[in-house]
């Protein structure tokens, strides 16, 4: 069975960075769908953290209708991530009421109506495709497992908002990530935080502190992706330039101290390094640890979450083929990241299409052989992908409200 996996669509993003809201950018994906038997949407399909779900649903409907027609009776599998964990929250709540229930496994397969009314609506729009739900992931082949990858935040050494939130929850519950050995362990510390984030956005638009803008601004100040010079260019006066530099210097000097304090508080282990290289390495280390702890060693593990596709041609494959969890033991997981379908402008510096964060990633899994990373939007320019380039009707489409 030929399976195409895509991840991190974030349909309904308040920044309009979600490219699949735009018909002309759906075409390459729909063409690829014509040659496969199954499509897996590997989490963060909807952006449910920026505002009420109705906004994301309105944006998502044309995509699901077109995808359903393209599949024409073939299978669509929907996997929840951290930004759309609410898609399976009702099922988790019902499950908690049962007197006898098996522990969460690596694959729970559900019909849409079992997962939530939200998923049932998406499945209806996707007809005539046959929609199922998998959580936290699914076995594509006996040697290929796919999941969104949000559990990696429990082990990430980069102090993102998500990592700090999970770390605080782990500390509060007295469940250190170093002891995790099952899906249930990860769900116990992540699900409460996800529920809180979704609750904040249920009736109002979330602010910058919670929708990622704060993290982006801090990363820019710390010099990520050459943003220091860009920030200086944006400063329109000598005074604003001076203030911008003073703010940046304060963040740069205070950042290691803040990280050290978080480590002393038991939120870590964290590192005071946020370069692009460290973002990649830290994400792979963390995902490799998740794979080892839940028993995926030696398999191919397809994931998303970090938005960083790979391995790419210039990547060191040794970073992606994780070492054994125990010296001399079974080999570690072989990681493949499906990338994203969002315009993450902060990561798209340099020549067009050269960034590993360039959107349009997909992973093709055939009946045998290694999963193949595909990049379906390499022929598009940054100007064509920018939200500012959207056609009139799409540019005026309201975000979550």
Language-model regions, residue ranges each:
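Extended recognition/assembly regions associated with phosphoester-bond processing machinery
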Residues: 1-401
């Amino acid at each position: 069975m030929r399976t195409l996996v895509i991840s991190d669509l974030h349909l309904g993003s308040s920044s309009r960075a979600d490219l699949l809201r735009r018909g002309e950018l759906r075409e390459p994906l729909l063409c690829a769908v014509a040659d496969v038997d199954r499509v897996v949407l590997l989490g963060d399909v909807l952006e449910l953290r920026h505002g009420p779900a109705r906004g994301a649903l309105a944006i998502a409907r044309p995509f699901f209708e077109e995808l359903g027609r393209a599949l024409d009776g073939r299978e669509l599998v929907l996997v929840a991530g951290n930004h759309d964990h609410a898609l399976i929250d009702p099922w988790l709540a019902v499950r908690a009421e049962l007197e006898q229930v098996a522990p969460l496994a690596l694959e729970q397969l559900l019909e849409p109506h079992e997962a939530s009314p939200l998923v049932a609506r998406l499945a209806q729009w996707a007809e005539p495709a046959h929609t199922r739900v998998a959580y936290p992931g699914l076995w594509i082949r006996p040697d290929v497992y796919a999941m969104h990858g949000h559990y990696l935040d429990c082990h990430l050494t980069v102090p993102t908002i998500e990592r700090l939130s999970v770390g605080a929850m782990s500390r509060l519950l007295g469940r250190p990530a170093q002891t995790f050995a099952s899906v249930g362990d990860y769900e116990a510390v992540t699900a409460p935080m996800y529920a809180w984030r979704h609750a904040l956005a249920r009736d109002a638009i979330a602010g910058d502190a919670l929708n990622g803008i704060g993290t982006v601004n801090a990363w820019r100040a710390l010099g990520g992706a050459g943003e220091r010079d860009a920030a200086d260019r944006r400063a329109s006066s000598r005074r604003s330039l001076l203030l911008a530099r003073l703010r940046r210097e304060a963040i740069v000097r205070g950042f290691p101290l803040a990280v050290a304090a978080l480590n002393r508080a038991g939120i870590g282990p964290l590192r005071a390094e946020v370069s692009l290289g460290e973002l990649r390495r830290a994400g792979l280390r963390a995902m490799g640890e998740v794979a080892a702890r839940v028993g995926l060693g030696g398999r191919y593990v397809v994931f998303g979450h970090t938005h960083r596709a790979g391995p790419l041609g210039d990547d060191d494959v040794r970073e992606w083929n994780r070492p054994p969890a125990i010296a001399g033991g079974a080999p570690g997981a072989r990681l493949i990241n499906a990338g994203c379908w969002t315009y993450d402008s902060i990561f798209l510096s340099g020549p067009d299409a050269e960034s590993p964060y360039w959107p349009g990633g997909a992973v093709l899994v055939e009946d045998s052989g290694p999963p193949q990373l595909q990049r379906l939007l390499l022929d598009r320019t940054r100007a064509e992908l920018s939200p500012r380039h959207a056609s009139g009707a799409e540019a005026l489409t309201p975000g979550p409200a």
